[in-house]
Amino acid sequence: NGITATISDSTLASVSATPAAIAGSHSLEIQTLAQSQKLKSANFATTNTTVGSGTLTIQFGTYSSGTFTLNADKAAQSIVISPSNSSLAGIRDAINQADAGVTASIVNDGSGKRLVIASKDTGVSNALKITTIDSDGNNSDNTGLSQFVYDASTGGVSNLAETVAASNASFIIDGISISKA
């Protein structure tokens, strides 16, 4: 007979037992859920508003003490925004079609349209750093494609605003604190 694992509330977590499991009881207390980072742009009048062209580069990593450390498991992703897809909607579509580890959506907040970029993966090591090569020649001003730069490290330029911080889940199993993406 094998050992089975059960949990009192299967909506909170899943459990399993290996053949080497020893019968017993454990406590699980969930402190916080893992979150993926979400960033929003300034407002645009319409989804057809021309923003700019160039290249968006998305990197994943961890921000700590004013420094960005790359996530070695994820390569940087570059997305070319051509003049033909340089509207707000075109940029959203180009980001989504690139399958670059993020999703892009447009939210109407009542005062305009905002581009929202979200990491597909949760955890502090999946925070975003977005840089541009902007066709207007200035890669960090608040016009053209550089309206979508984000670098929360010391001295970095961020024209996007963070709405949800990348965070790990934290929980306690039998009195032991654990943090996981």
Residue ranges and their predicted role:
Residues 1-181:
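N-terminal, intrinsically disordered, small/polar-rich Type III/flagellar export signal
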